[in-house]
Amino acid sequence: IAKALGLAVLASGGIYAAQRGVVDTFVQTTDASIVDFLGAVALAVLAFKGFTTITNSGGEIENPRKNVGRAIVISIAICIFIYLLVAAAVGTNLSIQEIVAARDYALAEAAKPAFGQYGLWITVGFAIIATVSGVIASVFAVSRMLAMLTDMELVPHSHFGMPGNIQKHTLVYTIVLAMTLTIFFDLSRIASLGVIFYLLMDIAIHWGVLNYLRKEISANRFILLTAITLDLIVLIAFIVVKVKADSIVIWTSLAGLFLIITAEKLYLSRKRK
């Protein structure tokens, strides 16, 4: 709540002190190709990944059949409102070149006319809150999911002498993996890797539901096929952009996929024996 309100206040201040109209901001034209645009959409998809934390916590939600879907719709609506507000604030005060130069501090720069130098400190403060809360939520959600997969004997597990239950172990593994990524990659590359793995995971889940669970859960075939198609379009465009701009991301993704698929196949084949 504090994160959303903070961003809304900063963005509102930026719009209040806008140097040009909000409507003009959203109708500006650029030289970007459709592939570049779709590549940017891929990163935007990652911005909405947080709602999967809700599904991963479904077992702890009261009346999950009703409230999980409702919570997802509400969270996406709030995100769209905040993101559009931030985009309007930044776009009405900064040029494309200024946005690129400001990078992570673009909102602070946009809010400067209204808040001055305090806008920077406010942005840093809310960025810390957003990062900490987001990391904690994601880490616990992922560790919970890994613990469930471990209980189902779908992924290997070793406690390495650690005390506690499986979820505490997977929590440690998740944090160690995240720390390893931050050592070898900057935030931009980590986000790019996240986009590729997330879209591939999304495609795999939709494909699995379409072929194995559609009748059991009464899933809509058209919606599943549409989701797979859109995911593929955005993923291919993002890969094309990254091949030209930062091929290390692609090679790292391929290596990661190879290791995961190989390890999982070996583990499952041994379990069957």
What are these regions (language model features)?
Residues I1, I122-I129, T180-A204, I217-F222, ...:
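Transmembrane helix-loop boundary segments of multi-pass membrane transporters
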Residues I1-L120:
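Helix-loop-helix junctions that connect adjacent transmembrane segments
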Residues S12, F197, N211-R214, A219-K273:
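A generic transmembrane alpha-helix motif of multi-pass inner-membrane proteins
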Residues I1-R20, D31-A32, I72-V73, V195-A204, ...:
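Membrane-interface loop-to-helix entry segments
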Residues F48, T55-E60, G119-H157, T182, ...:
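Membrane-helix boundary/coupling elements in multi-pass transport proteins
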Residues I1, G6, I61-P64, V73-I78, ...:
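Helix-loop-helix connectors at the membrane interface of multi-pass transporters/channels
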Residues A4-I15, V86, A127-I128, T174-I183, ...:
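Hydrophobic core segments of alpha-helical transmembrane domains in multi-pass membrane transport
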Residues V73-I136, L154-L187:
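TM-loop-TM module centered on a large, flexible mid-protein loop between adjacent transmembrane helices
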